Amino acid sequence: MIVMKFGGTSVESAVAIERVAGIVKARESQRPIVVVSAMGKTTNKLLAIANAAIDGKREEYIRQIHDLRDMHSREARQVVPLSDRAALDRTLDEHFQELTELVKGLAVLGELTPRSVDAISSYGERLSSYIVTLAFRHFGMKAEHVDSRDVVITDRRHTQAAPNFPETYTRLAKTLAPMAERAVVVMGGFIGSTEDGVTTTLGRGGSDYTASIVGAGVGAGEIQIWTDVDGMLTADPTILAGGHRVKVISFAEAAELAYFGAKVLHPATVVPAIEKNIPVLILNSRRPEVPGTRITSDSVPCENIVKSIACKRKITAVNIHSTRMLMAHGFLHRIFEVFDRYETPVDMVSTSEVSVSLTIDNTSRLDLILGELRQFSEVAVEHDGVIVCLVGENIRYTPGVARRVFNALDGINIRMISQGASLLNLSFVVAEADLPRTVGLLHQEFFSTLDADVFERKEPAHA
């Protein structure tokens, strides 16, 4: 049994869905459970509809709902057989009528609560999974649809719900595992529900997490994350075009990369997979012949020090200075207590005898945090930073990595530098404007030669 997750770009159109059907049909003998994201940018469009409603823009949200229904109907009708068209239209009518009533309620209240965000954003995956199920039947597969809210049970923390693993695993084993023996199972990612049936979501990018949870719950042989890139690369392709494919990487390295911005993987994805020792593959739905990246529980011998360079953008650095800090017991605890109270995670920390510098990416409660910090210290804030993170298990065993970074980046201002507690990463902060040059220089420094067992070199394109 395998779990196959397809992201929004992989199911964004009839053409894309037909491509996915071909990929799944070729693996039908492996008893796939298919997890899909919303079609294209549907989640963003749903949230735009909600915001138009609370702003009182009735004509706008009615038009947006109409356009969204048209898009789903237009693409679905190209991949759904005539015999299922009536059922398709009926289901679309039901879902969009529900959505319209929900949005009208928001317009009356003029308020968008986290619970409402979850209810509205869930429609993307609910629609796409139903359409993909009908499409699979059209292309000759026996396919069954499962509402994820019946099997992925979470707490009540809306927009960032945490799974209730014992209950979820029980339901998955009882429902999905037997179903996968007789049909291709299709379900939406990202969404779940509380035990009493209130819709929740796992956070943006949570479809990867769903796939991992499902894989762990049914004891899958592997979890395949199908994206629009060839796997994990040595650098973000939006920053550096010449990144090489990473053939194999450890769970620990992949988790570090995901946390620090490698968008092909949701940071939490690897946790259930690690616990159940299930390999995860990152594959390209547009180029299914490419082997992608295999993520395994075991460390992978590698001649290169660094496996990949990740970047986390829109970072804010908070610099805290206090002469009273010198030898003061509990000063750091007092600082982190403030960030914890306002539920603001800290990414990096660097300390000296009289100052602490740290970075955050969530600034929604920054003013409140600064107000408390300034009661016992001087605080300066720098915006528009980027965390650049070198990840690789060999970093912990190799002296002089930081020296090589500083030498390679001569002339670029490095604001702070930190080695993670795992010793798998070396991270530092640079200005957004310096990011392309920083990544290019580091890539040249650490990937001029490649271990052929771990990397596939991307040859430069010739005119």
Which positions does each model-derived feature cover?
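A conserved regulatory-domain signal marking ACT and ACT-like small-molecule sensing domains
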Residues: 289-463
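Nucleotide/pyrophosphate-binding catalytic subdomain
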Residues: 1-266, 270, 429-431, 450, ...
